[in-house]
């Protein structure tokens, strides 16, 4: 081993970075359950206190992928994930989940990776269950769903069994750790394209560079200036774009795409049932600000997936997919496929 857990802890306390092989060794000990819980807790807090680096996050993500149950997709063209870190405290309806079906209806192949609610009122898994989907699918069944329907959902606990060694420690700590930002980086289908929302402006550049280190093809990391971990309709959104191996950061605004602004708190829900109702209203072509924010995020997904040349074109395709009824058909096909497996 390159370093002991105690040495790694001391290094972090001194605000010194762990090298790639050192972080890899520590993460393998954590994921295998071989590191004492007290040391795991200490190391996670020390990493957070000194601020995790791009190299440390990338190494940790690679190890999580090693321990994950993979989903093998043969035709990987236009394969994309649309996901948020969560933890933004906005308690909105499931924007990225609605965008998943709209983007799939417009030609993207969605490999969505998500979980139940941690800090929100409704996680992606919660609203998909409310919509009638079966989440208890094997990796092979998810792969079939993605191949036949064009959209699949990988329920994180089904694909990351080693997380059982970490969950009790995270719950006891009750503070954010590196694991709060690892989920979106560890897609079991190894999608090389992603629209990722984050809970803090500082993470935009960091996560974009982590995705660069992980060999992603095209990524948009977004943070609404209002605090939303999606592209916001309230005002500007900070974007970190990875394309052709280069990261650049910029801002976008709803007005750039001819959309009216709307306050994020107008999208708040109390539970998964409320989220389901809004998702269905959007999918069923009821014009609203909710529909606009879904089309905005679906449009960005289509851009990242390589279906649209830019976000504006993606939004037009998203609106057309809803108006034609294709998005509703995609949702119904997804639910039926999940239940037939």
From Swiss-Prot:
Q: Which cofactor does it need?
A: Mg(2+)
- Hey, which pathway is this one from? Amino-acid biosynthesis; L-tryptophan biosynthesis; L-tryptophan from chorismate: step 2/5
Cofactor: binding comment: Binds 2 magnesium ions per monomer.
Enzyme type, top EC level: transferase
Q: Which reaction equation describes what this protein catalyses?
A: N-(5-phospho-beta-D-ribosyl)anthranilate + diphosphate = 5-phospho-alpha-D-ribose 1-diphosphate + anthranilate
Recorded E.C. number(s)?
Answer: 2.4.2.18
This protein's UniProt keywords? Amino-acid biosynthesis, Aromatic amino acid biosynthesis, Glycosyltransferase, Magnesium, Metal-binding, Transferase, Tryptophan biosynthesis
Binding-site list for Mg(2+) 1: 96, 230
Q: Which GO terms describe its molecular function?
A: anthranilate phosphoribosyltransferase activity; magnesium ion binding
Kindly list the biological process annotations in GO that this record carries.
L-tryptophan biosynthetic process
Kindly name one Pfam family recorded for this protein: Glycos_transf_3
Sites where the protein binds Mg(2+) 2: 229-230
Q: Name one GO cellular component term.
A: cytosol
What is the residue range of the signal peptide feature? none
- Say yes or no: keyword Signal present: no
Q: Which NCBIfam families match?
A: trpD
Quaternary structure and interacting proteins, as annotated:
Homodimer.
This one is known as Anthranilate phosphoribosyltransferase
Q: Which gene encodes it?
A: trpD
């Amino acid at each position: 081993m390159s370093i002991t857990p105690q040495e790694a802890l001391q290094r972090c306390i001194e605000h010194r970075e762990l090298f790639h092989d050192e972080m890899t060794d520590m993460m393998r000990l954590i994921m295998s359950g071989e590191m004492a819980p007290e040391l795991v807790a200490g190391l996670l807090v020390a990493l957070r206190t000194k601020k995790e680096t791009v190299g440390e996050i990338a190494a940790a993500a690679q190890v999580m992928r090693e321990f994950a149950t993979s989903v093998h997709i043969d035709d990987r063209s236009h394969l994309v994930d649309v996901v948020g870190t969560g933890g933004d405290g906005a308690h909105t309806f499931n924007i990225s989940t609605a965008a998943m079906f709209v983007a799939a209806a417009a030609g993207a192949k969605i490999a969505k990776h998500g979980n139940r609610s941690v800090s929100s009122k409704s996680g992606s898994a919660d609203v998909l269950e409310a919509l009638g989907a079966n989440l208890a699918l094997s990796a092979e069944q998810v792969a079939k769903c993605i191949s036949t329907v064009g959209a699949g959902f990988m329920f994180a606990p089904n694909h990351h069994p080693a997380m059982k060694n970490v969950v009790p420690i995270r719950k006891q700590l009750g503070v954010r750790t590196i694991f709060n930002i690892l989920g979106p980086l560890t897609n079991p289908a190894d999608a090389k394209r992603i629209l990722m929302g984050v809970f803090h402006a500082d993470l935009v550049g960091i996560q974009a560079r982590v995705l660069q280190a992980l060999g992603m093809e095209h990524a948009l990391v977004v943070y609404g200036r209002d605090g939303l971990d999606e592209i916001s309709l309230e005002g500007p959104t900070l974007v970190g774009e990875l394309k052709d191996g280069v990261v650049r950061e910029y801002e976008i605004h709803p007005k750039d795409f001819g959309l009216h602004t709307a306050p994020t708190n107008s999208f708040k829900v109390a539970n998964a049932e409320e989220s389901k109702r809004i998702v269905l209203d959007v999918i069923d072509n009821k014009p609203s600000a909710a529909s606009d924010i879904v089309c905005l995020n679906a449009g960005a997904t289509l851009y990242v997936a390589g279906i649209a040349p830019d976000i504006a074109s993606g939004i037009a395709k998203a609106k057309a997919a809803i108006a034609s009824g294709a998005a509703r058909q995609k949702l119904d096909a997804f639910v039926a496929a999940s239940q037939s497996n």
